[in-house]
Swiss-Prot record:
This is tRNA (cytidine(56)-2'-O)-methyltransferase. Its main location: cytoplasm. Its EC number is 2.1.1.206. Specifically catalyzes the AdoMet-dependent 2'-O-ribose methylation of cytidine at position 56 in tRNAs. Homodimer. HAMAP family: tRNA_methyltr_aTrm56. Belongs to the aTrm56 family. Gene3D superfamilies: 3.40.1280.10. It comes from Sulfurisphaera tokodaii (strain DSM 16993 / JCM 10545 / NBRC 100140 / 7). Pfam families: Trm56 (PF01994). SUPFAM superfamilies: alpha/beta knot.
């Protein structure tokens, strides 16, 4: 929420990269940043994940309301929430689409009261990038670490030392 292009470009880019790599279907971004879009489109073109969508929105509260009205649940990641270990099983058992809310600045109180769950990935200040990665890891139970994108032009050959990238046909 509340992407500030000049101040937040790296953090928001990293949120989008983690979301894509760890299995999310897309991301809503409050505000518009064509450089961010170009960066993620380039990643998708080379590394795959063409299904991953980026949608710039003017009214993120409407996104939350519409998501809930369509039967999905809204999870707000915040250090003030319920510990993730206390609530994760309940969320997984819901077996419905999930909208994850992370903020790049002080998040309005409205989101605390209009999310189905306020979840803490620890109760200390930390990065929304880390929080999203941990949350998606818990949702996919580690399976996201093995995601292979069939539309990838490039893929990594794991190495004990060094780097090896393969061009896919």
């Amino acid at each position: 929420m509340h992407h500030r292009p000049e101040r937040d470009k790296r953090v928001t880019t990293h949120v989008a990269l983690v979301a894509r790599a760890f299995g999310a279907k897309g991301i809503f971004i409050h505000g518009e940043d064509m450089n961010l879009l170009k960066t993620i489109e380039k990643v998708k073109a080379n590394w795959g994940g063409k299904y991953f969508s980026i949608e710039f929105v003017k009214n993120p509260k409407k996104v939350v309301r519409d998501w809930r009205n369509s039967g999905g649940i809204v999870v707000h990641l915040t250090m003030y929430g319920i510990p993730i270990d206390n609530i994760m099983e309940k969320i997984i058992n819901k077996n419905t689409k999930i909208l994850v809310v992370v903020g790049s600045e002080k998040v309005e109180g409205w989101y605390y009261y209009n999310s189905d769950y306020n979840i803490a990935i620890g109760n200390q200040p930390h990065s929304e990038v880390a929080a999203l990665a941990i949350f998606l890891d818990r949702i996919y139970k580690g399976g996201e670490l093995n995601i292979q994108f069939s539309d990838a032009k490039l893929s990594i050959i794991p190495q004990e030392r060094g780097k090896k990238v393969r061009k896919n046909e």
